[in-house]
Design a protein with these regions (language model features):
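Extracytoplasmic gate region of multi-pass secondary transporters
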Residues: 31-33, 214-271, 355-363
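Cytoplasmic membrane-interface "Motif A"-like loop-to-helix N-cap segments
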Residues: 73-83, 276-290
Length: 425
């Protein structure tokens, strides 16, 4: 009986870590759903709201590497619990704040604690499960997390409307604390899988070298230029864009936006398959960037789009947003195996920082061009031109990123094997 229980414990750890990975997506995307309520309650302008949205990415990016190091150095259950606790406290601060500065602190804490999400899943997977199961378990965790993102849009809006966002957030905080407590209390006697053990946590010179590696920094910069479709548009601006520009109702706008995350569930496997089929990861990255640019040109400059068309475009956008999987594969091929996880974390930090940059830039531009028109709730109403001026930065940055990758691939002659290497976090 005890042996059977011992075998189940790693599965339980993995399940609850994956559940938190989905949970943090729900908290992350809630700001976009509550945009009007937040602007009205705190009497802030769009620039301040853009700052609020971007604080999540600052916290997430800033803690990505420190949490990764702590997961290796200390008991991963304790590190995961503390990180989840930070997320929960940030959620409570976010919902109870009566001052905008406290709201910023709560959002920052949510981002910082959420950085443990996928890292803890990867740690549990590599610690307790055979190598042959790593890819499928990490893939399932990622898909599960994206299902949380899908739930965070339309279903969460329904919950907010029915119960109020205060009660809903308190409930989410309680659920998050419960997840963390269960992870902390699960004791596992299952022996760790024998893996190549490399201690990069104490090698400060290696960390410094990776941060100063021009190729990695260039890849991180170029990848960051292409994240605007997801972290800049879908996370916060898609819903008001569809509502005000294409006159979709609130439910249709929410559903269309959520399809980005549905598309991402399929995007990783599809792009990897195409990259292996064409024997060129480089080409698929370029194609994905071009397609994202085309999608935004259609969204911005078509005179009329219906619900079905916007839904299809957002689903396709989600597929092409998974170009990052191929970038991480390239990164892992450029460094020694023992450094791959830290190298990927370095590039991911840069990518996540661009989430803040896009939010800040777009909010400044759209506010600058705004004509002062507001609705009955005193929330700004933007024209098509306002949105075009702000959101155009996304396809422009995509083009710059594509050109940069073409230059990098040509200069470095990066060649990858036809099969995708497993990337560990």
């Amino acid at each position: 009986m005890s042996n059977a229980l011992s075998l189940k414990r790693p599965i339980l750890l993995w399940s609850f870590a994956s559940l938190f990975f989905a949970f943090q997506f729900i908290i992350r995307l809630s700001t976009g759903i509550l945009r009007e309520e937040i602007i009205q309650k705190f009497a802030i302008d769009t620039i301040a709201f853009g700052t609020l949205a971007g604080y999540y990415y600052i916290g997430y990016a800033g803690m990505q590497i420190p949490i990764g190091i702590m997961l290796d150095k200390f008991d991963f259950r304790v590190v995961t619990f503390v990180s989840i606790l930070v997320t929960v406290l940030g959620t409570v601060i976010f919902v109870t704040s009566s001052h905008f500065n406290y709201l910023l602190i709560g959002r920052l804490m949510i981002g910082a604690g959420s950085a443990v999400g996928f890292l803890s899943v990867a740690k549990i997977t590599t610690k307790y499960f055979p190598v042959k199961y790593h890819s499928i378990m990490l893939g399932l965790s990622f898909t599960f997390g994206l299902m949380g993102a899908v739930f965070a849009v339309t279903p969460m809006k329904l919950l907010f409307n029915h119960f109020g966002y205060n009660y809903t957030f308190y409930t989410l905080a309680a659920v998050g604390f419960g997840i963390g407590l269960i992870i902390l209390l699960i004791k596992n006697d299952q022996p760790e899988q024998a893996t190549y053990n490399h201690d990069v946590t104490n090698n400060k010179s290696l960390i410094l070298k990776l941060f100063l590696n021009p190729t990695l920094l260039f890849i991180g910069l170029l990848g960051g230029l292409m994240v605007g479709g997801l972290e800049g548009f879908a996370d916060e601006w898609a819903i008001p864009f569809f509502t005000q520009i294409y006159q979709l109702n609130e439910m249709e706008s929410n559903i269309a936006t959520s399809l980005v995350y549905v598309g991402m569930c399929f995007g990783g496997p599809i792009l990897v398959f195409l990259a292996d089929l064409l024997k060129s990861h480089n080409s698929i990255i370029i194609i994905a960037g071009v397609m994202m640019g085309i999608i935004f040109v259609i969204l911005l400059f078509c005179s009329s789009l219906n619900f079905l068309t916007t839904s299809i475009l957002m689903f396709l956008l989600g597929i092409f947003c998974c170009y990052q999987v191929l970038i991480f594969t390239i990164v892992s091929s450029l460094v020694p195996t023992k450094s791959a996880g830290l190298a990927i974390a370095t590039v991911n930090c840069i990518n996540m920082l661009f989430g803040h940059i896009f939010h800040k830039f777009m909010s400044i531009v759209i506010s600058y061009n705004w004509d002062g028109l507001v609705n009955n709730s005193n929330v700004p109403i933007y024209s098509r031109n306002d949105f075009i001026m702000a959101i155009s930065i996304i396809p422009v940055c995509c083009i710059i990123g594509i050109i940069g990758f073409m230059y990098l691939f040509q200069k470095s002659k990066i060649k990858l094997q036809t099969t995708t290497k497993e990337v560990t976090v």
